[in-house]
């Protein structure tokens, strides 16, 4: 049994900024309401075809313009599919997918906040130098020992997600004695590590679908409020995932209704950022949530 952080173990703003603020590109961004992160997959094999742009800058432009006009405040670009059992992608291939898109968006959509989804420090560094603003790491530094020092050097916001193993073997690592306690303990230790490196702008992601069974995913979602003990922004990424399609017996293309339902539940449980494929529908959900909780 792992100890659960209690109220006395909350991370106060002496170490990290207040929950609804982030330092981004020299600006203090204040978010009093939940935000939307629009997904742009620079891959040929991400599990939802509608999010794929590949290396086509025309398709990148189409997706980004749609996400921004529909209410996304962050764009999340990824060049390495992390779906269960996904194929390994070489470092240079990931760079070749990500960097041109970052430069294009930074040049043509000025003012947009660009997040890059990578667990590789080299990709992270090149992306920030190309115009990205934050790093979204599915391994929280566990797959590349240089990631955390690199983020510290770059002084950019860092999204730390919980996962065991890697995308190729993570679904073989789903045995927990106390999944909620173990994940909270993992983040408590991870935040201490980040603090020692001077990283202050941190967002946490429980990692739905990463080294978790269907039942474990729903258990974590039901208990999402427990992550409030960490006093940091909470990102939830459940959009069109198999935890929805398996229950509804549909494929990813048909999982929008289920995504919308669970996104509303996540907001009610304390989610601060929703990472989504369908920004328009997520924004409608957010408007209803903000009407319920003005």
Language model segments and positions:
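Active-site-adjacent loop and "lid" segments of alpha/beta metabolic enzymes
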Residues: 2-7, 13-17, 24-25, 31, ...
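N-terminal glycine-rich anion-binding loops that anchor highly charged ligand groups
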Residues: 31-38, 42, 66-78
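Conserved Motif II region of HX4D acyltransferases
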Residues: 207
